[in-house]
């Protein structure tokens, strides 16, 4: 895609997507989380992740930027992004998530990544089914569960993830980011 085509397509995006950080270096205000997650990746030991905290603190931006750094051009083959508030039932876990997790990539090495945004909106039955999928496909797939409210997730699901609390952004971080818009 040409640069002018990319520019035109970005012009039509919602503001929040148009200015979403593309790399971890562009994510502001969550330095401890980013440092720790980068260390996991560098050591080849990325666990299943839970990013939780108030809306607008960079949870989705952080995991998408990390995935883009890990997979590069293979992003679309190796990453499944779902908004669990849209697809919150057990059928999505049994079908879409399980199918993606169970399929091995022939030409790509490493694990696949499933990003579940707003997972705190999933039903308990869906969360319990997800726990079983995580256990079964852990050799092949990593999961990043994103939630505003960790207390709405089942204890079984919480216990399978390394938890990171995203803090509200300091005023200075907000001002720095706005300066780039």
Regions found by a protein language model. Give the residues of each.
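P-loop/Walker A NTP-binding region and its immediately flanking N-terminal helices
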Residues: 1-179
């Amino acid at each position: 895609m040409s640069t002018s085509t990319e520019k035109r397509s970005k012009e039509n995006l919602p503001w929040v997507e148009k200015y979403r950080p593309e790399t971890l270096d562009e994510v502001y205000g969550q330095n401890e989380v980013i440092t720790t997650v980068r260390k996991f990746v560098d050591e080849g030991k990325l666990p299943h992740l839970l990013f939780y905290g108030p809306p607008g603190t960079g949870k989705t931006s952080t995991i998408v930027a990390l995935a883009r750094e890990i997979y590069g051009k293979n992003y679309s083959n190796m990453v499944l992004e779902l908004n669990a508030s849209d697809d919150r039932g057990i059928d999505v876990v049994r079908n879409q998530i399980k199918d993606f997790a169970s399929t091995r990539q022939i030409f790509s090495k490493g694990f696949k990544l499933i990003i579940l945004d707003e997972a705190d909106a999933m039903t308990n039955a869906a969360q319990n089914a997800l726990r079983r999928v995580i256990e079964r496909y852990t050799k092949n797939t990593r999961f990043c569960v994103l939630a505003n409210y960790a207390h709405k997730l089942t204890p079984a699901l919480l216990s399978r993830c390394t938890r990171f609390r995203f803090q509200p952004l300091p005023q200075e971080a907000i001002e720095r980011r706005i300066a780039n818009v």
